[in-house]
């Protein structure tokens, strides 16, 4: 069954997981309000990645008006328009649930050395994937 799902859901260049736990990402999520579809951007730190293959999910945490907000996104959801990598974080844990108990400067994550180069490579890869996608649809 998993093999069938892998064949149906072939990961394209935009959809491959280009982030890990501790990275700051912007998730462009499509929502429908009163019959209109718009894209909402949710920016935060990835605190966990769960499951495997087609059911893979990731949890993004951000602090909004002094309240921590976490949202779980399925990686292969058709409602996700784009996942944009903002910065690479240096962490030594697979799950960052301890960030829930921290506030302010204590909740910061150090940036990975060479992270800016990785972010720029990711942007170039996404632009190239978008360009090839637009040429194939025309």
Curated annotation (Swiss-Prot):
Record's keyword annotation contains Signal: no
One Gene Ontology term from the biological process aspect of the record: translation
Keywords for this protein: Ribonucleoprotein, Ribosomal protein
Pfam families, per database record: Ribosomal_L19
GO cellular component, one term: cytosolic large ribosomal subunit
Cysteine disulfide links: none
SUPFAM superfamilies xref list: Translation proteins SH3-like domain (SSF50104)
InterPro entries given in the database record: Ribosomal_bL19, Ribosomal_bL19_CS, Ribosomal_bL19_sf, Translation_prot_SH3-like_sf
Molecular function via GO: structural constituent of ribosome
Domain of life (superkingdom): Bacteria
Record's function text: This protein is located at the 30S-50S ribosomal subunit interface and may play a role in the structure and function of the aminoacyl-tRNA binding site.
Similarity section: Belongs to the bacterial ribosomal protein bL19 family.
UniProt-listed NCBIfam families: rplS_bact
HAMAP family hit by this protein: Ribosomal_bL19 (MF_00402)
Protein's recorded name: Large ribosomal subunit protein bL19
Annotated source species: Leptospira interrogans serogroup Icterohaemorrhagiae serovar copenhageni (strain Fiocruz L1-130)
